[in-house]
């Protein structure tokens, strides 16, 4: 089994990689890649519908996209990670973004916008201490354990978009 760890930031990726190298053996092989925070952004109103471009007209309100779309905010980084995923022959991905709602949103907005289908494991660790990361690597959880947090992250982002428009 081979997986790709997707960390929220390079410093976290390096910490996890160090724990993996020193904390084995593990029943899987891992490669590593890092986001740089938010790689994706929610589409702007005009990217859904040209008539939603500013200045806004009362007859077009409320602006409610269905479905909400995410687009690359950092195209070179998205392309680099997607190339690694496509060429890596991975059996699964590891969501190693921060252990909180926003971390879920960063990972899943990337995953869904890029139509990824690989199974996902969750590395859940709120510190970067090597010993804690080793324990978390030995106890990767199924992504479905965090479905509620994933949904909450998207509801929050959609609400913010609607309230801001």
Residue map of PLM features:
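Intrinsically disordered, low-complexity regulatory segments
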Residues: 1-165
